[in-house]
Swiss-Prot record:
Catalyzes the folate-dependent formation of 5-methyl-uridine at position 54 (M-5-U54) in all tRNAs. FAD binds at G18, G19, G20, L21, A22, G23. It catalyses: uridine(54) in tRNA + (6R)-5,10-methylene-5,6,7,8-tetrahydrofolate + NADH + H(+) = 5-methyluridine(54) in tRNA + (6S)-5,6,7,8-tetrahydrofolate + NAD(+); uridine(54) in tRNA + (6R)-5,10-methylene-5,6,7,8-tetrahydrofolate + NADPH + H(+) = 5-methyluridine(54) in tRNA + (6S)-5,6,7,8-tetrahydrofolate + NADP(+). GO terms for molecular function: flavin adenine dinucleotide binding; tRNA (uracil(54)-C5)-methyltransferase activity, 5,10-methylenetetrahydrofolate-dependent. SUPFAM superfamilies: FAD/NAD(P)-binding domain. Its EC number is 2.1.1.74. Its cofactor is FAD. Keywords: Cytoplasm, FAD, Flavoprotein, Methyltransferase, NAD, NADP, Transferase, tRNA processing. NCBIfam families: gid_trmFO, PRK05335.1. The keyword Nucleotide-binding does not apply. Belongs to the MnmG family. TrmFO subfamily. This is Methylenetetrahydrofolate--tRNA-(uracil-5-)-methyltransferase TrmFO. InterPro entries: FAD/NAD-bd_sf (IPR036188), MnmG-rel (IPR002218), MnmG_N (IPR040131), TrmFO (IPR004417).
Length: 451
C-alpha cells in the first residue's frame, strides 16, 4: 500500500517518540501506509548518557544484529522482517561488514542512511525535541532503555508506579529439554501446592566448587552512568557478590535446601538451585535468584557446573543494567496497544524485548498497527508460529509477577506437531519453515513486496 499525499492531507499525523531502531522503523511503516508522521528525537537537544551522535538508529552497544542463518532464532526474526519490508533490516543488509555468521554493520554509514531515509520521506516530519508527556491522539512510544526522566514520570503516572521498571536484573533462562532429568527433580518445598519448581541438588563438594568458580569469574564492568546511579542496584545483589560474603550465604539464601528431598538419596541436599517455569508450555526455565553481572561466556561456564545443567542451553543470560521497561503482560495487547488506551502503542526495549532485531520487530508491528488505526483497517496480530508473533504473544501474556525482558528464541514457539525431532538442527529448520509458511499465509509479505 504505497503512500499517497492526497489521502495523507486528510489524516492527522501519528506521533512517534524516539528515533532509535524501533521508532525509526515505526515511523517508516506508518508513512509507507500513507499516513503522516511526526518523529520526535531528543538528541542533540538533550543527549542520553549512552549515545554519542544525533543520528537515528545509533547502535550504542555492539554493531551486530546477531545470527544471519534463518535456522537460528535471531536469523529467523530478521528473515521475517526482510520479507515484511523492514527499512532497518534492509539498511543493515546494505551496510553489512564481514562478521562470520552474523549480520554486523558499519555503524556510522548505517545510522546515516537511516537518518537520510527518514529525513527525505515526504510524509515524515523529523523534530529534534524532547517530549516530556504522553502525546494525544494515535502515538507510538519507542523511547528505549534510557527514557528521559520527565517522560518516565509521565509513563509512571499513566501506567501506575509498579508497572514501570528502571533497572533490569534478569536471571538466566534455559530450555527444559536441555536439562539432565536424571538429576533434576520436580517439587515444591515441603510438598506444598503444585510441584512448580525444578530442583538441582548439590553435595557439599559440588556447592563449594560452584561458589569458588562464581567468585573467580569475570564480570561486566558498569558503564559510567550506571556507577553514578547506584540506587538502581540496591536490594538486588548479584549472585556472585552474595557468594563473596561467605561460604554459607548462598545456601541460606537462594540456594537453601530446606523442605526439599532428593529422590535419588531420600535425604535433603546440601544446597539446591531452583528453576521456575517461564512459559505456559514449560519449555523455558528461569534460574531463581541468579541475577548476575558475569560476562555471558562466564555464565555458561560457571552455571553448567550446577548438577543437571551440564549441557544446559541458555536462551537468555543474566544481566544487571539500567533499563526502563514496562510490565507489558499487565499493560499491552499482542498488537502492542495499551489495554487502557488503544490509540497509544509502544515498541522497542521499552516493552521488554531484548536485542536490536527485536526492537525493529516491535517498531514494525506498532507502526503498522498505528497506521491501520488511522485508516480504519483491521489490526495485525502475527501468527504464534512466527518468531515475531510468539515474541509479542509472550510479552503480552507472561506472568506479570516475574516479567523480565526476553530475546527471540525458539523456546517461545509452539511445539512441532507429530513425532519429537531429536536433532536440534533439524528441529530449528522445521521451526523456520513453519514460521515462514505461516507468515506467507497472512498475505503481509505479498503486500510488502508490492508497496
Amino acid at each position: 500500500m504505497p503512500h499517497s499525499m492526497s489521502r495523507a492531507e486528510t489524516l492527522a499525523p501519528i506521533h512517534v517518540v524516539g528515533g532509535g531502531l524501533a521508532g525509526t522503523e515505526a515511523a517508516w511503516q506508518i508513512a509507507q501506509l500513507g499516513v503522516p508522521v511526526i518523529l520526535s528525537e531528543m538528541r542533540p537537544v538533550r543527549q542520553s548518557p549512552a549515545h554519542h551522535t544525533d543520528q537515528l538508529g545509533e547502535l550504542v552497544c555492539s554493531n551486530s544484529f546477531g545470527a544471519l542463518a534463518s535456522d537460528r532464532a535471531a536469523g529467523l526474526l530478521k528473515e521475517e522482517l526482510r520479507q515484511l519490508g523492514s527499512l532497518v533490516i534492509a539498511t543493515a543488509d546494505r551496510h553489512a561488514v564481514p562478521a562470520g555468521g552474523a549480520l554486523a554493520v558499519d555503524r556510522a554509514r548505517f545510522s546515516q542512511a537511516l537518518t537520510e531515509a527518514i529525513a527525505n520521506h515526504p510524509l515524515i516530519t523529523l523534530r529534534r525535541e524532547e517530549v516530556t508527556g504522553i502525546p494525544e491522539g494515535i502515538a507510538v512510544l519507542c523511547t528505549g532503555p534510557l527514557t528521559s526522566e520527565p517522560l518516565a514520570k509521565a509513563l509512571q503516572a499513566f501506567t501506575g508506579l509498579e508497572y514501570l521498571s528502571f533497572f533490569d536484573a534478569s536471571s538466566p533462562i534455559v530450555t527444559g529439554d536441555s536439562l539432565n532429568r536424571a538429576v533434576v527433580f520436580q517439587a515444591s518445598r515441603y510438598d506444598k501446592g503444585e510441584a512448580a519448581y525444578l530442583n538441582c541438588p548439590m553435595t557439599e563438594a559440588e556447592y563449594e566448587r560452584f561458589c569458588q568458580a562464581l567468585v573467580e569469574a569475570e564480570q561486566v564492568p558498569l558503564k559510567d552512568f550506571e556507577k553514578e546511579e547506584r540506587k538502581f542496584f540496591e536490594g538486588c545483589l548479584p549472585i556472585e557478590e552474595m557468594a563473596r560474603r561467605g561460604k554459607d550465604t548462598l545456601r541460606f539464601g537462594p540456594l537453601k535446601p530446606v523442605g526439599l528431598v532428593d529422590p535419588r538419596t531420600g535425604s535433603r541436599p546440601y544446597a539446591v538451585v531452583q528453576l521456575r517455569q517461564e512459559d505456559r508450555a514449560g519449555k523455558l526455565w528461569n534460574l531463581v535468584g541468579f541475577q548476575t553481572n558475569l560476562k555471558w561466556g562466564e555464565q555458561q561456564r560457571v552455571f553448567r557446573l550446577i548438577p543437571g545443567l551440564e549441557a544446559a542451553e541458555f536462551v537468555r543470560f543474566g544481566v544487571m543494567h539500567r533499563n526502563t521497561f514496562l510490565n507489558s503482560p499487565q499493560l499491552l495487547l499482542p498488537t502492542l496497544q495499551f489495554r487502557r488506551r488503544p490509540t497509544l502503542l509502544a515498541a522497542g526495549q521499552l516493552v521488554g524485548t531484548e536485542g536490536y532485531a527485536c526492537a525493529v520487530a516491535g517498531g514494525w508491528l506498532a507502526g503498522q498497527n498505528a497506521a491501520r488505526l488511522a485508516l480504519g483497517l483491521p489490526l495485525i496480530t502475527l501468527p504464534p508460529e512466527t518468531m515475531m508473533g510468539s515474541l509479542f504473544q509472550f510479552i503480552s501474556s507472561a506472568d506479570p509477577k516475574h516479567f523480565q525482558p526476553m530475546p527471540a528464541n525458539f523456546g517461545l514457539l509452539p511445539e512441532l506437531e507429530g513425532q519429537k525431532v531429536r536433532s536440534k538442527q533439524e528441529r530449528y529448520a522445521r521451526y523456520r519453515d513453519r514460521a515462514l509458511a505461516a507468515l506467507a499465509a497472512t498475505g503481509l509479505v505479498r503486500q510488502a513486496q508490492t508497496a
